[in-house]
From Swiss-Prot:
Record flagged with keyword Zinc: no
Signal peptide: none
Organism: Aspergillus fumigatus (strain ATCC MYA-4609 / CBS 101355 / FGSC A1100 / Af293)
Gene: gem1
Record-linked InterPro entries: EF-hand-dom_pair, EF_Hand_1_Ca_BS, EF_hand_assoc_1, EF_hand_assoc_2, EF_hand_dom, Miro, Miro-EF-hand_domain, MIRO_dom
Entry protein name: Mitochondrial Rho GTPase 1
Amino acid sequence: MATVRICVCGDEGTGKSSLITSLVKGVFVTNKIQPVLPQITIPPTIGTPENVTTTTVVDTSALPQERSNLAREIRKSNVILLVYSDHYSYERVALFWLPYFRSLGVNVPVVLCANKSDLAADHTEAQVIEEEMLPVMAEFKEIDSCIRTSAREHRNVNEAFFLCQKAVTHPIAPLFDSKESALKPAAVAALQRIFYLSDKDRDGYLSDKEIEDFQMRCFDKPLSKEDLVHIKETIQKTHPDSVTPFGIDCRGFIHLNKMYAEKGRHETVWIILRAFQYTDNLSLQESFLHPRFEVPPFASAELSPEGYRFFVNLFLLSDKDNDGGLNDAELASLFAPTPGLPASWADGSFPSSTVRNEAGHVTLQGWLAQWSMTTFQSPKTTLEYLAYLGFESSDRSNPSTTAALKVTRPRKKRKRPGRVGRNVVLGHVLGAPGSGKSALLDAFLARGFSHTYRPTIQPRTAVNTVELPGGKQCYLILDELGELEPAILENQAKLLDQCDVIVYTYDSSDPDSFAYIPQLRSKYPHLEELPSVFIALKADLDRTTQRAEHQPHEYTAMLNMPSPPLHVSATWSSIQEVFVHIAEAAMEPSTAFPRSEEDVEGKWMAWGIALGAVVCAGAAAVMIWRRVSGSG
């Protein structure tokens, strides 16, 4: 909502105070009025732009002794009503007033007002505009609009102040470059995005149905067939190729809005921009890009069913060649209404972080996995891109982009039996250099095995779906920490909050590989508070004895782990079972912790109870048999 502060300037005797009085009283005041009126505040009335709360009108004096007060009021205003009434005061507009405003360093719109039109009956409206106003407007681009008024006849008085309000609420300067006679780049970019979002079938044209939907969204009233025909005819006069049987193309849409701006109908352009959440500086509203969304400790953010539907539909619309994958051109087109790929995607080497087909194009599975990971790691990023990409909530009680997300239940006591209430889980893959961590991530994404060793410096992430026993699916994120491993493992609070499982890996053919794991757990004892999975990689090679205090199976037995290390090779097809095991450990964390003495005692007690029940049942059967035999 805007508060408009109008500073009324001009030479003495041009009728500034009379204009203000006529506005307030509704009629011309014949009595002598004071030279400078006190400041007045006008509440919103019928005809006031809808986003104006209050309007303050400030009268000023042009006398030299009042120059400091004049400068102060000009600097406080957000629009200037510059009044002239005769040839002399008109000449002073270009010679003194407009250069004076510039000298003060103010950057506010100016409404040029030719007052006392009742005294210039020999000049028509068109003559005044063409001979007086247009030359000045051409020289001084800060002039937003012009109007001819008469305070005595109460002619165009309200309209003059309405133009001032509109100059603040619907400024022309951010939209149109009068010197170049073209829309400014930021305005073109905003309108291109609006066209893209309104083109629901992504065929490059706004069909009649899409134009009607656009009309209702922006103006909340239907478009008549006559108006639609007129719009098309208007575009065809300049760009005949922009109107086709399929509809209006983007060039025609931009040209139509340029014409609105050129002809003083920039209010129409602003209505369109604001319907799509644009601010006065042509950026998207902060509350729209970053709505309030909080994730409690030990909880996580995931896409809701509506969020998944949106990204599925976006994928299907963008896969123009219907090959089941998004190539570079299709991805570029999809992200056209955004600043580009999310920074986290670029840092994570997208698209190599997710599932691709044989041609290297991102599959639907990979697309959804990538957004699931993004939402888990940075829900604010997902919300921002949902806004850029045009997500519209179907939930009237929550029209925000937050309808596409949900928050999982906090998981605090991981050792308590049961599944966690989430569908996206994160595992850190740890191990000595050369243990096979990168090959494990490649196998997770069904990539071919590479015999070339490349040490991981930058963190690397892979995300994919895993089907659990029973048919339920979850998204598993595996990351190799690279040089950031010490920093991530030292941050105990963040590690315990975000990580769901630790995957310890070692090269079963390298005698020095396993020793890294006990050293790591000793250095970061809080790792014991996370579910753990131990994996012996490179099982296709000859297994060797590890140069460690304890052999891997002895170490896991000493920890009372539920199972010894899993032996597997990235070259084996059975490696997919390892990812199911990791996902199960994350989804049911109690199964991946060392068994406590209570667990063992509980098992013996259960065996004892079961054995006792069997013995009692047997004794009872013998007693019954004897009674039956005795009675016989």
